[in-house]
């Protein structure tokens, strides 16, 4: 009997060690990838040799950690889905014993914990630490900046928890909620994270439909269009004229204080870079020009309409079945049953659709005018913008599993703290969310594909002159018949 207990304890110990090693390796890979991504966009001029360099290194480490957690949140649902199918295909294989329900639940809990840590502690600390200078009267240095940052974090925490306490007291009229703060960990922190999750899902609701329509323009800029859709020779001629004009202005010293020599050199480099890209597009083969572009556009159409159809079907399920609610569904255990009719193929298609929604949400986020100034630029992004971008990506990626389950894109149950949000059990919020997503996506697609027809109709009836004031802000696309959203 004692030997059996020792054997069980040893197995549990080895299982926990194995899970820790796997989690560490996965996070190390994500951290390395995130580091190179940030270094690609971070401004090189931010690297000083004084205390500011130390502050920048600390902020860079925290931003890299946050971006790695964001990557883990994005991969969380696809990894869980594919792991469930692998366990069903090879239930007793020796080589996949490490892949079990305990590991998956541990990953969900770790991502939830680190998301909270980055959102409420690390990112505010990085921002305040970067902007701090030390209190007046104290000796300048790293210690003074750390002291100021900690005090600012304490004041921010008091402000946020005060707002959350008032909000929860207004919603719940019981005397306990208005008189006590003892249940801070059990009540107010989950309530705060639930509000942040709802805000992230609302941000995804705003960004994803815009991104789904914007993806056609983005892919059109990356791929080589057929000759009938764009005239590369004309574009190269225009770029060559711009390059010659900038070169003459630079050589002649014809620039003012507003249009300095540095800006002329920057515009000249951009013109030459655009010219080299156009030359590569011109030298593309015939199959790239006539086959790849239509195939990609068709795939985008299929993925977009598939997401709209799945959301529409989910609305019908919500109306007739209580288990369709994201918080009310209690499926079988991990690795016990498949969630797809077509097994591995269905899981693969679902994972592709989830990644497509995430990419579309990021594209839509940077396409919105309010967030367009956040767009990172290669080797020209300040550390403050890096912090803002990492925080935005964290909010979007943390809400991705919740949005995918709420819209019915996947039937995989939310694990850990992701499935404990109160608003997931509200029928009206979930149905309204699905309806708004379907309607907004349809309207964005209709606006996208009818823009050329709408412009021609306005020209035919003479109303295009009324929009002359807006044409300077809306730059046409290279093919001349599409407008960016």
Curated annotation (Swiss-Prot):
GO cellular component, one term: membrane
Pfam families: LMBR1
Membrane topology: Multi-pass membrane protein
UniProt keyword annotations, A-Z: Coiled coil, Membrane, Receptor, Transmembrane, Transmembrane helix
Localization in the cell: Membrane
Transmembrane parts of this sequence: 19-39, 62-82, 110-130, 150-170, 192-212, 291-311, 339-359, 383-403, 426-446
Function: Putative membrane receptor.
Major localization listed first in the record, in broad terms: membrane
InterPro entries from the UniProt entry: LIMR, LMBR1-like_membr_prot
Keyword set includes tRNA-binding: no
Residue intervals annotated with topology Cytoplasmic: 40-61, 131-149, 213-290, 360-382, 447-485
Protein name: Limb region 1 protein homolog
Keyword Nucleotide-binding: no
Annotated coiled-coil segments of the chain: 261-284
PANTHER family given in the database record: LIMB REGION 1 PROTEIN HOMOLOG, LIPOCALIN-1 INTERACTING MEMBRANE RECEPTOR LIMR
Family classification: Belongs to the LIMR family.
Extracellular side: 1-18, 83-109, 171-191, 312-338, 404-425
């Amino acid at each position: 009997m004692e030997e059996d207990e020792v054997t069980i304890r040893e197995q549990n110990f080895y299982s926990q060690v194995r899970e820790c090693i796997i989690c560490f390796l996965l996070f190390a890979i994500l951290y390395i990838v995130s580091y190179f991504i940030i270094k690609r966009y971070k401004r090189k001029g931010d690297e000083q040799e004084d205390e500011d360099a130390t502050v920048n290194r600390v902020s860079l480490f925290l931003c890299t950690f946050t971006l790695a957690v964001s990557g883990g949140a994005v991969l969380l649902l696809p990894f869980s889905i594919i792991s469930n199918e692998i366990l069903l295909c090879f239930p007793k294989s020796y080589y996949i014993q490490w892949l079990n329900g305990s590991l998956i639940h541990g990953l969900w809990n770790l991502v939830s914990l680190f998301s909270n840590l980055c959102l409420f502690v690390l990112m505010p600390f990085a921002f305040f630490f970067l902007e701090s200078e030390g209190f007046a009267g104290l000796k300048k240095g790293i210690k003074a900046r750390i002291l100021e940052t900690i005090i600012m974090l304490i004041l921010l925490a008091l402000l946020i928890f005060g707002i959350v306490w008032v909000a929860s007291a207004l919603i719940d009229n019981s005397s306990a909620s208005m008189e006590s703060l003892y249940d801070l960990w059990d009540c107010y922190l989950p309530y705060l994270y639930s509000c942040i999750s709802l805000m992230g899902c609302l941000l995804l609701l705003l960004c994803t439909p815009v991104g789904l329509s914007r993806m056609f323009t983005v892919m059109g800029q990356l791929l080589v269009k057929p000759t009938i859709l764009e005239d590369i020779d004309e574009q190269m001629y225009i770029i060559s004229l711009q390059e010659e004009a900038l070169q003459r202005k630079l050589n002649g010293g014809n620039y003012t204080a507003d249009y300095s020599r540095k800006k002329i050199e920057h515009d000249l480099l951009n013109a030459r870079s655009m010219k080299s890209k156009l030359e590569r597009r011109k030298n593309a083969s015939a199959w790239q020009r006539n086959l790849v572009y239509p195939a990609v556009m068709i795939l985008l159409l299929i993925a977009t309409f598939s997401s709209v159809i799945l959301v529409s079907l989910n609305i019908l399920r919500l109306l007739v079945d209580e288990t369709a609610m994201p918080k009310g569904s209690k499926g079988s255990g991990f690795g016990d049953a498949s969630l797809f009719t077509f097994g591995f193929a269905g899981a693969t298609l679902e994972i592709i659709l989830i990644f497509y929604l995430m990419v579309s949400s990021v594209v839509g986020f940077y396409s919105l005018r309010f967030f367009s100034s956040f767009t990172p630029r290669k080797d020209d992004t300040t550390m403050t913008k890096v912090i803002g971008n990492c925080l935005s990506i964290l909010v979007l990626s943390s809400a991705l599993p919740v949005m995918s389950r709420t819209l019915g894109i996947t039937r995989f149950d939310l694990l850990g703290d992701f499935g404990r949000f109160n608003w997931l059990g509200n029928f009206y919020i979930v149905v309204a969310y699905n309806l708004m997503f379907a309607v907004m996506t349809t309207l964005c697609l209709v606006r996208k594909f009818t823009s050329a027809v709408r412009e021609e109709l306005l020209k035919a009836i003479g109303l295009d002159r009324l929009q002359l004031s807006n044409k300077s802000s809306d730059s046409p696309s290279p093919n001349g018949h599409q407008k960016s959203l």
